[in-house]
Amino acid sequence: MTSVAKPSLDRITKALAVAGAFVAFGCGESNPVPSSSAGRVWVHQGEAQGTTYTVKYVSQDSVSQTAFEACLEEVDVEMNAWRPSSTLSQFNGSTEVGTAFSFADSAGVWEDVWRISEEVHRLSGGAFDVTVGPLMKLWGFRMERRDVVTPTMVDSVRQFAHFAGDVIRFVPKSRAGGAALSKSDPRTELDFNAVAQGYTVDAMAQVLLDRGVTNMMVELGGEVKCLGLNQHSQPWRIAIDRPQEEGRTLQAVLPVADMSICTSGNYRKVSVVNGQRFSHTLDPRTGAPVTHGLLSATVLAPEAAYADAFATACMVLGPEAGQRWIAQMQAQGEEVEALFIMDGAGEAFTYWATPSLEAQLEWLEPLDKYDPTLVE
């Protein structure tokens, strides 16, 4: 498969680690580790999408590494922003306005990711937006550096950087025999960084499910899906990082079964614009960086694509609006749990978690509970 040589610098920092899941085997190998009653434990590792992946599963037989690589390639060829030949790169570079940019979407990747992106955009009230790329560039959150950004500049870019109206349209292949995109401004670009890796994790898990494997942990770039149980017939144990700028400290461990877990954070990427220090989380509804104290948002949902997108939306919404949004989705029957870690007094952090998740957290570094009256 084609690996991405250059990591996506605009990718929101992932604050997630897999506790006890990484095994020191060579890249791309399939290796058994001690057996359980359900079979051997197999581990595949490799590089893809500018990061690394680990697939760990319990089975009598190993699944070929090429099956995972083929799955990764299906997404990569469509949505890798660093691959000039990808469908995404070709569309973003297109200057055609109003005319259809047609492509096969033979694996249905675009149809799936577009549907999820539209849904989360709607559910979050616009906090999740896959057209935010030009605004990220404006603020210097990509490769470019920007010292000054004015409201006039923001308003100008927002005319062609919002996921609504006639700015951009997608026609899925199910209704057209082939998929098609069109944009009303040549500067409009799409950016699926906050959903594509989660979607890929779901697809890799499906590779195992299609072969009868039901106990697995699949991780790509910090996005994780856990199905069934581990080799000890226990839920998979996933560790969450402490949101610190340098070094690494594990904050907590969470047992996870039959759920996906994704974390978004902004604490390792900052820029100085207009004399102010901003994190690299931008609110697409205003076109400006967020200023609240939410440092990381960990979200659990059945599908990794949704957990990935939900976590990004929470980072935009902030601690209080994010809590209300999660509670609203739960009230509507969504299977979603969340953990937020916020700035506290001095060097301290505070946290908020949904009750079910909080009851399962194993704290490695204790935190005080978040008190909104002290910060907002």
Question: What are these language model-derived features?
Answer:
Residues 2-16, 22-376:
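Mature catalytic core of soluble alpha/beta enzymes
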